[in-house]
């Protein structure tokens, strides 16, 4: 939650919610994470080259992994700069198809984010019971996942948050947590 709020605070709010379903591969539990890393690398490279004439912001995203229904999938919240949304969403199935070998039906789903706090509570429902109450989340078992269940990009990590606060880029007040995200 802190990472997503920090994205909003540094004016790189998470704009799209993408769910990618990974094919089942017997005996290779880490394949979905490797495949997602390839998709994310393609997206990062594409954004870098599209924005080469301007200051380049790093890829800003948050992702959680779930496997409740037996199909491992990633919930990916990503910042897509205005003006590049159409091109990005057109390239997404191409990247997924290249990594998967073909694009199966139902491999991905994309939605715009209108209520960030609601989406965060949804994707973080796999949080451990001991921690969920702090965030107002009703925990639900989301299956076994190999690797980290929740990951934020390095530009939203703890060190980046501390650096941005130290540099005066972000000023946190007691009202910061209660601020509504812009529509």
What are these regions (language model features)?
Residues 1-72, 80-183:
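Right-hand nucleic-acid polymerase module
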